């Protein structure tokens, strides 16, 4: 397994799954610094910008891109 795959697996394992991937709210992103914060920002705000439902949110509870 190469370094990139190991890093991505480690990043996924350290992401909290219970709060919509909001990494900054849980640990400030200090674990991987800007890389982890950027990954969290993409997951957090991409759905809100597009007004889509995030995949972890039931459609009936979705309101303008937020659960």
From Swiss-Prot:
Q: Where is this protein found?
A: Secreted
Alphabetized UniProt keyword annotations: Cleavage on pair of basic residues, Disulfide bond, Ion channel impairing toxin, Neurotoxin, Secreted, Signal, Toxin
Top-level taxon in the UniProt lineage: Eukaryota
User: Which is one GO molecular function term here?
Assistant: ion channel regulator activity
Q: How is it modified after translation?
A: Contains 2 disulfide bonds.
Stretch forming the signal peptide: 1-20
Regarding tissue, the record states:
Expressed by the venom duct.
Cite the propeptide residues by number: 21-48
Transmembrane region positions? Answer: none
Q: Does the keyword Phosphoprotein apply?
A: no
Please tell me one Gene Ontology term that the record gives under cellular component: extracellular region
Q: What is known of its domains?
A: The cysteine framework is XIV (C-C-C-C).
Q: What does this protein do?
A: Probable neurotoxin with unknown target. Possibly targets ion channels.
UniProt lists the family membership as follows:
Belongs to the conotoxin L superfamily.
Question: Which protein is depicted?
Answer: Conotoxin Cal14.2c
